[in-house]
Design a protein with these regions (language model features):
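Short acidic, glycine-rich surface-loop motifs adjacent to enzyme active sites
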Residues: 8-10, 26-56, 79-80
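Stable alpha-helical elements in mature extracytoplasmic
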Residues: 24-27, 61
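Subtilisin-like serine protease catalytic core
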Residues: 1-22, 39-40, 57, 71-73, ...
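Substrate-binding/specificity loop regions of serine endopeptidase catalytic domains
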Residues: 49-191
């Protein structure tokens, strides 16, 4: 992945190989094309997992893998569940209008930057409030098509860029993408 792509995903490790979903899909397409040309079956193991994305199977990468896997003589193997006991993912149900649910993220001393995705199934819409470890509250941000809202927390010195995308192009769902910089340790609440 390029530096710009890594920055957009709030990834500051540049000393390890990283790939965009598009690079992985191009590699998959190439391998399958060569197998077809040689008239051979093919099994492709693609061990490139991600915490990002809707995880519904409706994204472009997932749909492409499903389409390739449906072809005779083609098997695509991907890893799943590698972080099942690490509280990396969460989900919840908001029963009715006005209900409030908290997503709590415990940030450690060494965690300085963090990308956060909150997915909302279509056609539902939500407002987002953020509570810092010191109790500072940013109230009821909401989608206005696609926007970037820059937030600065006074006591923590943390900066967040909140982007609402509705509908997100590959799934049709709503995506709230938060890029958090200079995080302070403690429990951050997203409600």
């Amino acid at each position: 992945a390029t530096k710009v792509e890594l920055d957009a995903a709030v990834i500051d490790k540049t000393d390890v190989p990283s790939y965009t979903p598009w690079s992985a899909l191009l590699a998959l397409r190439y391998i399958i094309a060569v197998a077809r040309e040689l008239k051979r079956p093919v099994v492709v193991f693609e061990p490139l997992g991600s915490n990002m994305g809707s995880h519904t199977g409706n994204g472009i990468v997932e749909q492409s893998i499903n389409n390739y896997s449906a072809q005779s003589g083609t098997v695509v193997v991907v890893p799943t569940g590698n972080q099942g006991n690490t509280d990396t993912h969460t989900e919840g149900i908001i029963e009715s209008s006005g209900d409030i649910k908290d997503i709590e993220i415990r940030v450690g001393e060494k965690q300085k930057n963090l990308p956060i995705e909150i997915w909302v199934n279509k056609p539902n819409r939500v407002k987002l409030s953020i509570v810092s470890p010191s109790g500072e509250v940013i109230h009821k941000l909401e989608a206005k098509n696609t926007n970037n809202e820059r937030i600065k927390f006074l006591y923590e010195g943390t900066e967040m860029i909140v982007n609402f995308t509705s509908p997100e192009l590959s799934t049709g769902d709503s995506l709230i993408f938060i890029r958090a910089y200079n995080l302070k340790a403690g429990i951050w609440k997203f409600r």
